[in-house]
């Protein structure tokens, strides 16, 4: 399958409470939010360009750039970070006239969705979570780099001589894709060019300080009531398969699917497999209970 992202559809800006989001929309049907990861240069389109077009055949795909990413607001966050993101996402849903939705998420976006589902259960019909770290411990051993692998990678990418195309390529090959030979050059360039955004570089220069207070959601996950699929790459370089197994048992209605020959961005690396797994989850009989 061709993994090269096509040109993004025309997006729009939406004011949601105190924040302005930039979002893309495709398709009609049940509303599905796609929440992207937190790596340098990530946007909704960089993470979901190929697979979202499959979902758009039957769903209304809503693809916001998360706060501090892409073309959305990049103001400093104060207070608990996941509470801030979750509350702002609910504001966005309300502004769009959406009461409840499915959420398909990678990494950073998945932790936002879990916080949202725990605090606003009436707004979530289901969650699909890939590569997210809502809990600061592993079930069997400490997390890689004490759970700071992503933050360390960001600081290395922006440090030294600053962002380069080769540093972006190496970051994606080392941490996000299982088979580096499959990474489309167009995706590398898209991420690299976005990472040069002056506001993103200003945020990165301050490391964690403008992101808000980190939150461990372990005590909150028991409040996640909706069906939740943890769809994980067997070779995820951030969190090994025992971690989503732990998460699955922390939420009320968890399921786990492991996909081989996949790492942290399996929705990009194996979009057809990812689509069929997630779409079957959304269509399963008990999903509507």
Residue positions per predicted region:
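Conserved HGGG/HGGXW glycine-rich cap/lid loop of the alpha/beta-hydrolase fold
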Residues: 22-71
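Active-site loop/oxyanion-hole signature of alpha/beta-hydrolase fold enzymes
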Residues: 53, 63-104, 276
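Gly/Ala-rich beta-loop-alpha elbow adjacent to hydrolase catalytic centers
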Residues: 105, 109, 113
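Flexible "cap/lid" loop of the alpha/beta hydrolase fold
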Residues: 114, 118, 125-163
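Conserved alpha/beta-hydrolase catalytic His-Asp/Glu region
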Residues: 138, 144, 161-223
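Short beta-strand/loop motif that positions the catalytic acidic residue
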Residues: 224, 230-232
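Acidic catalytic loop of the alpha/beta-hydrolase fold
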Residues: 235-239
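Catalytic active-site module of serine/aspartate enzymes centered on a nucleophile-bearing elbow/loop
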Residues: 254-289
């Amino acid at each position: 399958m061709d993994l090269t992202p096509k040109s993004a559809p025309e997006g729009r800006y939406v004011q949601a409470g105190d924040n302005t989001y930039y979002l893309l929309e495709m398709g009609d049907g049940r509303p599905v939010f796609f929440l992207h990861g937190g790596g340098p240069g990530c946007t909704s389109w960089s993470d979901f360009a190929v697979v979202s077009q499959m979902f758009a055949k039957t769903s209304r795909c809503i693809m916001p750039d998360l706060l501090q990413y892409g073309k959305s607001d990049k103001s400093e966050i104060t207070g608990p970070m996941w509470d801030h993101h979750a509350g702002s996402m609910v504001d966005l849903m309300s502004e769009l006239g959406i009461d409840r939705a499915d959420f398909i998420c990678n990494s950073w976006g998945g932790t936002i969705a879990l916080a949202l589902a725990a605090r606003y259960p009436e707004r979530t019909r289901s969650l699909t979570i890939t590569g997210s770290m809502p809990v600061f411990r592993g079930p069997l051993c400490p997390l890689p780099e004490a759970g700071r692998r992503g933050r360390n990678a960001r600081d290395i990418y922006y440090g030294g001589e600053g962002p380069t195309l080769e540093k972006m390529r190496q970051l994606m090959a080392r941490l996000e894709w299982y088979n580096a030979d499959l990474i489309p050059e167009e995706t590398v360039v898209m991420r690299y060019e976005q990472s040069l955004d002056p506001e993103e570089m200003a945020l990165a220069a301050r490391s964690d300080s403008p992101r808000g207070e980190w939150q461990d959601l372990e005590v909150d996950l028991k409040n996640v009531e909706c069906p939740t699929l943890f769809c994980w790459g067997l070779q995820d370089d951030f969190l090994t398969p025992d971690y989503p197994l732990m998460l699955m048992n922390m939420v009320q209605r968890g399921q786990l699917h492991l996909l081989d020959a996949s790492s942290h961005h399996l929705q990009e690396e194996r979009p057809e497999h990812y689509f069929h797994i997630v779409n079957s989850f959304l269509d399963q009989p008990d999903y509507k209970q």
